[in-house]
Regions:
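Conserved ATPase active-site switch/coordination loops adjacent to the nucleotide-binding site
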Residues: 82
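Vicinal oxygen chelate
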Residues: 1-39, 48-79, 91-93
Length: 93
């Protein structure tokens, strides 16, 4: 998949699926190896519900903090059905 906002020589995102899965440690944001991928979403709770409906799991609570420039950031961590950690985040003024 070509990432938006780039011309022909754009970075790509490759997603693989395997028939045989290797058991690994439980999902944790700070586990060794690949960390997580983050997505900016319009509404964190709605996006989280969609991930859970598709077979994902909760990794932590939904958190909202005010930043030093008076914006708010809301985020949470979930896993996809294969256990990959996903961060869902939303910024507001």
């Amino acid at each position: 998949m070509r990432l938006p906002g780039y011309a022909e020589a754009a970075p790509t995102l490759e997603i693989f699926n395997y028939d045989v899965l290797v058991v690994r440690a439980p999902a944790a944001v700070n586990r060794p190896g690949f960390g997580h991928i983050a997505f900016s979403v319009d509404h964190v709770a709605s996006a989280r519900a969609a991930v859970l409906h598709a077979g994902g799991q909760v990794v932590g609570d939904i958190i909202t903090l005010q930043t030093s420039d008076d914006r708010k950031v809301t985020w949470c961590y979930v896993t996809d059905p294969e256990g990959n950690v996903i961060e869902l985040q939303s910024w507001s003024e």
